[in-house]
Regions:
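Low-complexity/repetitive intrinsically disordered segments
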Residues: 1-7
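Gram-positive cell-envelope targeting signals
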Residues: 2, 13-15, 19
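Extracellular carbohydrate-recognition regions
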Residues: 18-52
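Generic alpha-helical hydrophobic packing signal
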Residues: 26-33, 39-41, 63-67, 93, ...
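Short small/polar-residue motifs
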Residues: 47-60, 119-124
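Short, exposed beta-strand/loop patches in secreted or surface proteins that constitute
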Residues: 54-61, 68, 129-130
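Extracellular ligand-binding interfaces
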Residues: 68-147, 155-164, 169-171
Length: 172
């Protein structure tokens, strides 16, 4: 089969990025430690929300959100611990989010400072799994005996999928 384009015809365009599902109301976020230092709210910056394979990250500092869009086979993005955070032993991570599509599936894994390139506590991607489209918040247990290095959010062969992160709260 030979495909040809007529002279003067425009080139095909890429698949448009998805538009957001109905979202929750904006939330008020204060970065850093709470008063009794039992919870740390991760600042959403280009350093703390890192793109991996097959992802794009857009941080909106005014809205205090990060939009991650996924495209490709097993794309991933990372939540990185800031360098000025000396104690990164946490019992759980709470992620407040809005999904961009209903049909795509996402999973997660933790990475600790004792082996920075190894994924542990993996939750495999399913449509209604860790980041269900009808939920807007998830609390995920962490190994509180280890220093958290990164938290990985990955897709399962996503095609123009993603979500908006509104807050990341790490609990002692």
């Amino acid at each position: 089969v030979v495909l040809k384009r007529e002279a003067g015809a425009t080139a095909p365009t890429a698949t448009p990025k998805p538009t957001a599902l109905p979202t929750t109301a904006p939330i008020e976020v204060t970065y850093g430690w709470n008063a009794d230092e039992t919870e740390y709210t991760l600042p959403l910056t280009e350093e703390t929300v890192g793109k991996g394979n097959g992802t794009e990250v857009s941080v909106d500092t005014n809205a205090k959100t990060a939009t991650i869009t996924y495209d490709g086979a097993y794309p991933d993005a990372f939540l990185n611990m800031p360098g000025d955070l000396s104690d990164t032993k946490f019992s759980s991570i709470i992620i407040k989010y809005d999904r961009l599509t209903e049909k795509d599936s996402f999973g997660y894994a933790s990475r600790y400072t004792d082996n920075k390139s190894t994924d542990v506590n993996i939750k495999w991607a399913t449509v209604s799994g860790a980041f269900a489209p009808d939920a807007h918040e998830v609390e995920i247990p962490l190994d509180k005996t280890k220093d958290l290095y990164q938290f990985k959010i990955f897709g399962n062969a996503c095609d123009s999928a993603g979500f908006i992160i509104k807050a990341v709260i790490l609990k002692k």
